[in-house]
Amino acid sequence: MLRSRVPANIRAFDAFPKFSKEYRRQSSSRGGFFTILLSVLIVVLVFSQCVQYIRGIREQELFIYDSVSELMDLNIDITIAMPCSNLRIDVVDRTKDLVLATEALTLEEAFIKDMPTSSTIYKNDRYAGLRWARTEKFRKKNNAEPGSGTACRIYGQLVVNRVNGQLHITAPGWGYGRSNIPFHSLNFTHYIEELSFGEYYPALVNALDGHYGHANDHPFAFQYYLSVLPTSYKSSFRSFETNQYSLTENSVVRQLGFGSLPPGIFIDYDLEPLAVRVVDKHPNVASTLLRILAISGGLITVASWIERVYSSRAHRSTSEADMLGLLGKSETE
């Protein structure tokens, strides 16, 4: 009864007007897909920027090495399948200086069965360098008693002249006069865990680190030719001078007889006149956050444009279908 007393124009008044159906936003699975895709992209972006912030950006440049330095360190850690008493280690350089490395290095008894092989090295080193797991320059000692080992681990640091030279590991007497080591005792199968020049840097993996060499015969010779490149490293935490090198290798069976070259392991190193400077730069927190926000905003804007284009196309297709339906209905009538 009260409704009949209200004027018609007041009854028609609506404080919350209804939109026409064609302007209403229809829910669809497409919007959910775009939301999930955009969320995944933003998460990947944030993760990549965090990784870049932690690792930093590495820049390298070449320059002429003009520093004057007379000496450098030679770091070595090698295991050879021969007793220590059957080995001799020397370093000779272009100035004809001879370093009796047998006395300067540590020779430690080991066992052949404990030496890594090419298959075990590949299995353990597929995903990471051998040196990444080590924090000390040289690992702990073996458990072999003196005189009981079938192999010899040679490790330590030598101070040599900063000129071209050669480190050679041979058997006493072979190539230096009358041999006192039996022929059948020669076995220069070896595993090089560490060979570097300059200050020790665990993150720098050189070409001979983790290298395995198998001797196919008793009078076997391994020849390694190294091109040593001085390297200057600088980061936010430290800076130092070290070296890295490239490798060319060759192996051959020596011919026995007077005047023949001795079997063994020969490492020739040549110093390059060029040097490389490595600089690690870490972006600050503010620039990283601004970069994340800028790229995230760009992704959201592009995603909204794409969604709007798809929505307009879908709306146009729906309108055309409705129009065709109305025309068909009118023709039928």
Curated annotation (Swiss-Prot):
Any one of the GO CC terms: Golgi apparatus
Residue ranges, Cytoplasmic side: 1-30, 307-333
Keywords: Endoplasmic reticulum, ER-Golgi transport, Glycoprotein, Golgi apparatus, Membrane, Phosphoprotein, Protein transport, Transmembrane, Transmembrane helix, Transport
TM spans (from-to): 31-51, 286-306
Lumenal-side segments: 52-285
One GO term of the biological process aspect: retrograde vesicle-mediated transport, Golgi to endoplasmic reticulum
Keyword set includes Transmembrane: yes
The keyword Protein transport is assigned to this record: yes
PTM sites of type Phosphoserine: S317, S319
Glycosylation sites: N187
Membrane topology per record: Multi-pass membrane protein
InterPro entries per record: Erv (IPR045888), Erv_C (IPR012936), Erv_N (IPR039542)
Pfam families per the UniProt record, alphabetical: COPIIcoated_ERV, ERGIC_N
Subcellular location: Endoplasmic reticulum membrane; Golgi apparatus membrane; Endoplasmic reticulum-Golgi intermediate compartment membrane
Stated family: Belongs to the ERGIC family.
Function: Constituent of COPII-coated endoplasmic reticulum-derived transport vesicles. Required for efficient transport of a subset of secretory proteins to the Golgi. Facilitates retrograde transport from the Golgi to the endoplasmic reticulum.
Protein name: ER-derived vesicles protein 41
Lineage, opening ranks: Eukaryota, Fungi, Dikarya, Ascomycota, Taphrinomycotina
